[in-house]
Amino acid sequence: MGLKAKLQGSKENAVNSMIYKSYYDDEIDDNLVYLESRDGLDFTGNIFRIVEELSTGKYGDLKIYVHAKPQAEDKIRAYQKNYNLKIDKIITKEATATRILEKAKYIFTDAGIRPKYVKREGQIFVNTWHGTPLKLMGKDNVAEEHRLGNAQHPLLSSDYLLYPNQYMKSTMLEAFMIDRIFPGKILYEGYPRNSVFLKPSWLKEKLGLEDKEIFVYMPTFRGVLMDRDDSVQRDDVENYLSQLDSRLNDGQMLYAKLHVLNASRIDFDKFEHIEAFPEGYETYDVLNMADVLITDYSSVFFDFANSRRKIILFNYDEENYCSYRGFYIPLEELPFPKVQNVDELVSELNSAKGYDDEEFIKTYCQYDNPDAVENILKTVINGENASLVKTIGNGKKNVLIYAGSLTDDMINRLNEVVDVDEYNVVLTFKQWDEHICNNHEEIFKKLPQGIEIIQFRFNLTPTLSESNNSKSLLERSFQKQFPNIEFERIIDLTDKKDEISQILNNYIVKK
């Protein structure tokens, strides 16, 4: 659909008008805080701990708004009751969430953000991400390298990227190809969710489990995000839990929790010594009861290592898993015992911790501390120097190049014009381009070395007023696609003059 046709699509334009009214007309509300966890599918971890700290009232009379999909709303309300959280509004409607986003002063997320959100000057956006990476991601995960844009939008929109260790900072910025061009600040501080492991567990006593040896099993997500099969993991886990249940004694209890992306139900009623995580309590409060953590390829072990308690890797499907998902850290370099069957697992559960993890903790729990969330909010909201904050960048100007479908001829032209010695060269293309989606592995290998990629993720979404003012639409579309980034030059190598060309050429004229 061309630009003219989109400008005439009045029904959707009316919806966009409602969404972007805040962007164009409303002042930013200095007391409004917007938060979302896992794209609204969950409410746990860093985002939960930030809400918990904000609820103390130490940071002024703030209005706390949380976006959640309908299936997560009951969980949030249970947390409100058990933790006395001050949440002023739970937003379940997408359009409403985006409107509130556009006028919120403070924004916190641990993953993505509403796709129609456009960053505004004066907003403060903090991205905590959802864990130190073990598994390859971004450009390093070949199966999904052509979908970089899904993570780039919230990362580039951020004023602060939170990293609990130097390894995570370097790995993430390079994997998502923003290490040379991210214009915001790096917040070196502990993860809010990890502070619980540096304090005694209060939940074990509350649940009457003082005389129990507690095990927690938290397996990772399996599969490619766009091609999920929850039932496969559910069947595997259920089989192993059945075997394990018969081997545990009455003084032992195991709590099992599937990854949020594998939320298939398991019938726990048939087990004697195994239960699902108790509802109404934050995940890491439950995990902090554990004497032993059982996991596999999940980043949870980076966090739990703070407790200095035993970790077992139950990697029964290592060969198969590694066939489609690689690791930054070889499993054999991790200090934790690794088991492939229930017999080996039971043996380790009944054995004391027998490995040295001090170097691991020093590297991957580098900035974790009991006061992390307080330090973050003092820095972000109060403007205090409570955390280590750094900027990155190489001092070079940024150049943006649009090269269409990245045919061989276009790649040859790219190699002729790219100068990575003088500029940070950013390549953009349509994330949904069929030729690129079908041939991305071959194409990416041919691209010039040293360039960054920001995939063009969004179609035009005009409002009613923009139907008569395409310039405003093009300016907003550019800001949504390339938040916070300034370009010295923009080069359009195509002759199609499609939507992307119009957006980029409008930016050139504006400058």
Model regions and ranges:
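A nucleotide-sugar donor-handling region in carbohydrate enzymes
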Residues: 2-17, 132-138, 150-227, 261, ...
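Donor nucleotide-activated moiety binding/catalytic core segment of transferases
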Residues: 89-105, 260-302, 307
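Active-site and donor-binding regions of nucleotide-sugar-utilizing enzymes
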Residues: 34-197, 461-510
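Catalytic binding pocket for nucleotide-activated donors in carbohydrate/polymer assembly enzymes
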Residues: 267-272, 299-365
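A donor-sugar binding/catalytic signature common to diverse glycosyltransferases
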Residues: 105-136, 281-324
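N-terminal pre-catalytic "stem/leader" segment of glycosyltransferase-like enzymes
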Residues: 1-98, 392-486
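Conserved catalytic-core segment of nucleotide-activated headgroup transferases in glycan assembly
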Residues: 44-51, 56, 191-267, 406-417
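C-terminal amphipathic helix plus adjacent low-complexity
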Residues: 342-406
